[in-house]
Amino acid sequence: MIITDTPIDTLAGSILDGASISSEQALALTALSGASLQSLFAAASRVREHHFGNQVSLCGIINAKSGLCPEDCAFCAQSSHHATGVACYPLLDQDTLLAGARSVAGHGAACYGIVTSGSGISEGDELEQVCAAIRAIRAEGRIAPGASLGTLTKTAAEQLKAAGLVTYHHNLETSRSFFPQICSTHDYDDDVATVQLAKQVGLRVCCGGLFGLGETMAQRVELALTLRELQVDSVPINFLDPVPGTPLAVMQQLTSLDCLHTIALYRLILPDVHITICGGRQRNLRELQSWVFLAGASGIMTGNYLTKEGRQPADDLRMIEDLGLVIAKEMLR
């Protein structure tokens, strides 16, 4: 199959030699199907193996503060604009956050994310509670602490960095062109600014999106190119698992091949960036969950998600072993 006059394997070779795939080439790849799609997966797997070998990384999260979010994101169970019946509670205490870190580390994960609902964390007592938990996690030395606390001020970012935070997670969720269809309570540039600020203070940045919201494949490419421009360190890929009570509750489910197609595109656009498959994995990929690595992913989130149960870590570990892959053991710094 010829892609903009370049065979897929030749395109992969040029990427491995340091070339960047163009917007036109990426858009052409969105039209692939059938055997050509299998060739795309093979190319993406080749690029993944070049940069990450046979190692894959695991991460886990804790819903550290749930519900009552003032944002109106159309997919979110925790938005106060939607009647979802989600559990609502304030920031968990340090002992609970530390216990969560130990549990996630025990399953071989390299990163543990403390996730709070809301537009952004309140400076003062709430931020200091998170920083205290980060210091305690770093002191045990078993897993790298991450946080997803909404938009950041420079003061908060510097305080988190000083406490020992390794990774800051803040998704753009979708492309700039589609974002107004998903959220009206803040601007896309607010999210971009938080990503830039986190990088500015020296944090590793985890930033990706959620697919199946009604966006086009071209808009998925648009997001990937934005992430490349922002030079993020890790890209989490989520697939919509609709929540009753949200505006997107009746969205049509993605096909497994559509999900894998998206993963492969992201690998070729972001060849040396960690790509982690997170929410919606079981519902959308079903029997093809193990194919995420063959399509170019270099990691998965294991355990529970924010408001839904995830797959048992033991099942994920067995899947990785069956593929002849190994868990990356080195802790992020």
UniProtKB/Swiss-Prot annotation:
Per the entry, the cofactor note is: Binds 1 [4Fe-4S] cluster. The cluster is coordinated with 3 cysteines and an exchangeable S-adenosyl-L-methionine. Binds 1 [2Fe-2S] cluster. The cluster is coordinated with 3 cysteines and 1 arginine.
Cite the CDD domains for this sequence.
Radical_SAM
Family, similarity comment: Belongs to the radical SAM superfamily. Biotin synthase family.
Source species, please? Trichlorobacter lovleyi (strain ATCC BAA-1151 / DSM 17278 / SZ)
Q: Write down what this protein is called.
A: Biotin synthase
Q: Which sites bind [2Fe-2S] cluster?
A: 206
User: Catalysed reaction(s)?
Assistant: (4R,5S)-dethiobiotin + (sulfur carrier)-SH + 2 reduced [2Fe-2S]-[ferredoxin] + 2 S-adenosyl-L-methionine = (sulfur carrier)-H + biotin + 2 5'-deoxyadenosine + 2 L-methionine + 2 oxidized [2Fe-2S]-[ferredoxin]
Q: Name one GO biological process term.
A: biotin biosynthetic process
Pfam families xrefs: BATS (PF06968), Radical_SAM (PF04055)
Binding of [4Fe-4S] cluster occurs at 69, 73, 76
EC number(s): the record gives 2.8.1.6
Quaternary context: Homodimer.
Pathway(s) it belongs to: Cofactor biosynthesis; biotin biosynthesis; biotin from 7,8-diaminononanoate: step 2/2
Name the needed cofactors.
Answer: [4Fe-4S] cluster; [2Fe-2S] cluster
Q: What SMART domains does the annotation carry?
A: BATS, Elp3
| Alphabetic keyword roster | 2Fe-2S, 4Fe-4S, Biotin biosynthesis, Iron, Iron-sulfur, Metal-binding, S-adenosyl-L-methionine, Transferase
